[in-house]
Amino acid sequence: MSDNAPAPKKPARNNGAVVMMCLSFVFGMGAMSYAAVPLYRIFCQVTGYNGTTQRVDQVSSVVLDRTMRVTFDANVAPGLQWDFKPVEREVNPKIGETIQVHFTAENRSNETQRGQAVFNVTPGEAGVYFNKVQCFCFTETDLKPGEKLDMPVVFYIDPEIVKAVESKDIHTVTLSYTFYPKEGPKPLALNEGGAVKSEKKL
């Protein structure tokens, strides 16, 4: 009588289940990557991470007897033929004081261009305390050929900045903007009478 017992049979692999698992993994990773950008943006807005400023609807009710030096930086990414710069290079508002500054943008190309401003604050620890009430960066900007636009920014520094360990010794912050080209339908050109110009078909 042989002592060699027959080897147990391996259960048949369910190929369908394996395929479904692989597909679920692929679709799951795709969904995560798609959601990563908006989730990261929300995270930055809530925490001020990476110098992201805050958008608010109300001004501060507290104004401290201490000033903060705020400098401004303006840049234009390739693809936009714009002259973009701050009117005021720096201001020294009291912490908690609401203040308005201005930037100008001029389209030096021969066509209408659309841009979107991206912003940040340095040092990054100050971002969560830099509150913007009004800003051209909240919307896209269209400029016709040769058009020049005055763009105000209304902001204040949250008084809480002097209480946080990581930010209480900050005395200068820089608000920086970069305009990037934004794709989208361009506004229809108008003739001198204000009517939409019709395109000639060949």
From Swiss-Prot:
InterPro entries on file: CtaG/Cox11_dom_sf, Cyt_c_oxidase_assmbl_CtaG
PANTHER family the UniProt entry points to: CYTOCHROME C OXIDASE ASSEMBLY PROTEIN COX11, MITOCHONDRIAL-RELATED (PTHR21320:SF3), CYTOCHROME C OXIDASE ASSEMBLY PROTEIN COX11-RELATED (PTHR21320)
SUPFAM superfamilies per record: Ctag/Cox11
Main location: membrane
The organism of origin for this protein: Rhizobium leguminosarum bv. trifolii (strain WSM2304)
Transmembrane segments: 14-36
GO cellular component, one term: plasma membrane
HAMAP family for this protein: CtaG
Name of the gene this protein is made from: ctaG
Family that this chain belongs to: Belongs to the COX11/CtaG family.
GO BP: respiratory chain complex IV assembly
UniProt topology in membrane: Single-pass type II membrane protein
Single Gene Ontology MF annotation: copper ion binding
UniProt topological domain (Cytoplasmic) ranges: 1-13
Periplasmic topological segments: 37-202
Keywords: Cell inner membrane, Cell membrane, Copper, Membrane, Signal-anchor, Transmembrane, Transmembrane helix
Protein name: Cytochrome c oxidase assembly protein CtaG
Pfam families: CtaG_Cox11
Function: Exerts its effect at some terminal stage of cytochrome c oxidase synthesis, probably by being involved in the insertion of the copper B into subunit I.
Subcellular location: Cell inner membrane
